[in-house]
């Protein structure tokens, strides 16, 4: 639910020009101090960028496969450093993250056994 609200809010911020935002703020008699959601939005964008960077670093080892993802993740393809890589984003709580870690470990063990 929070993710949906943030997505909708980010779309509105992107679509709405800065001038329109000022008019809305003036019309509602709001000041920057009274609109902390703008600061939160910037912090969320920074956190998402950081998460994506760590995801790219993690998936350099699984460049052409999403098998390491497990069922608790969404897999998508992207380009980084001239290579197509797979990105996986965890969807779930601590339990699913533990399962993801175990699945990833098993997958790496299998690939090591197949290599030897």
Swiss-Prot record:
Prosegment location in residue numbers: 18-53
Broad class of where this protein is predominantly found: secreted
Disulphide connectivity of cysteines: 55-69, 62-75, 66-112, 68-88
Record-level Gene Ontology MF annotations: ion channel regulator activity; toxin activity
Subcellular location: Secreted
Tissue spec: Expressed by the venom gland.
GO cellular component: extracellular region
Signal sequence extent: 1-17
Ranges that cross the membrane: none
Keywords per UniProt: Disulfide bond, Ion channel impairing toxin, Knottin, Secreted, Signal, Toxin
Superkingdom, natural source: Eukaryota
Annotated region described as Disordered, given as residue ranges: 24-46
Keyword Electron transport: no
Recorded family membership: Belongs to the neurotoxin 03 (Tx2) family. 02 subfamily. HNTX-XV sub-subfamily.
Function in brief: Probable ion channel inhibitor.
Domain notes: The presence of a 'disulfide through disulfide knot' structurally defines this protein as a knottin.
Protein name: U30-theraphotoxin-Cg1a
